[in-house]
Amino acid sequence: MATGQKLMSAIRVFKFGGPEVMKLQSDVAIPIPKDNQVLIKVHACGVNPVDTYIRSGTHNMKPLLPYTPGLDVAGIVEAVGEHVSSFKKGDRVFTVSTLSGGYAEYALAADDTVYMLPEKLDFKQGAAIGIPYFTACLALLHSACVKAGEIVLIHGASGGVGIAACQIARAYGLKVLGTAGTEEGQNIVLQNGAHEVFNHREVNYIDKIKKSVGEKGIDVIIEMLANVNLSNDLNLLSHGGRVIIVGSRGPIEINPRDTMTKGSSIKGVALYSSTKEEFQQLAAALQAGMEVGWLRPVIGPVYPLEKAAQAHEDIIHSRGATGKMILLL
């Protein structure tokens, strides 16, 4: 560490494992932006399920140890690299990825993963945009290629990605069905664009969905927990229906004939494999949503930086999501 280099507090992970492997350190060097990089003073950072998969070592992405978790930050630009022209010190911004990790007082990001945060949205809302909204937009507009008038079912609709999917689907003229596991979660789903909501903890909730949509079935299913729901999803689809897998925590056995008889398809999405061109298209759609007003993140539990391990426990084991989980700095 260079003499006189400024320090910050940050969560550090020295080995893959449970939430307890995350340690708060106060002697981490503040990164210095190079070329096309932006240094952001972090005001809030989103906590995503993918953060827990990466931390546990079960995700395809395995950062070099030690590392700082966190991809979605919102804050103020502190400094920029010499080749950055789109941002300047003092700008309010949010990110869809970071280079140095977002569970920290400062975060470094490539300038093409940084976006201006409108004044109408606060920093907590800004930290809830990145992965949830870009993922939902990718799933609905690029992978499912939804059309106005289609029926979409969003599993886990009360979480960050789920709420984003509800808002986007409603804005694009779809009939929106959602599932959630608590009364509070169901109310949030209805408040954010769903026409109907179903309690996935009820034994007969699949039958209720079938009754609601009738013989036609569902055109698109946005699936957050494929290892639990995928087999049922295939039976709910219309002819030519699509299941878009956003999340899964393990394997599941399905009958391929369920796809053959309806000409249906299963497609997985992973935001980190998207091209720069796709990110630009997603960003344009979401910026329009901010301007018009349908993009309005819902904030769930809020934790201080030192409670990051508790946040990771809660995002996996909570009874039901109620908005986006945030670390507030």
UniProtKB/Swiss-Prot annotation:
It comes from Sus scrofa. One of its GO terms (biological process) is xenobiotic catabolic process. GO terms for cellular component: cytosol. NADP(+) binds at residues 53, 158-161, 181, 200, 229, 246-249, 269-271. Belongs to the zinc-containing alcohol dehydrogenase family. Quinone oxidoreductase subfamily. It is found in: Cytoplasm. The gene is CRYZ. The modification N6-acetyllysine is found at residue 23. Homotetramer. This is Quinone oxidoreductase. The lineage of its organism: Eukaryota, Metazoa, Chordata, Craniata, Vertebrata. It catalyses: 2 a quinone + NADPH + H(+) = 2 a 1,4-benzosemiquinone + NADP(+).
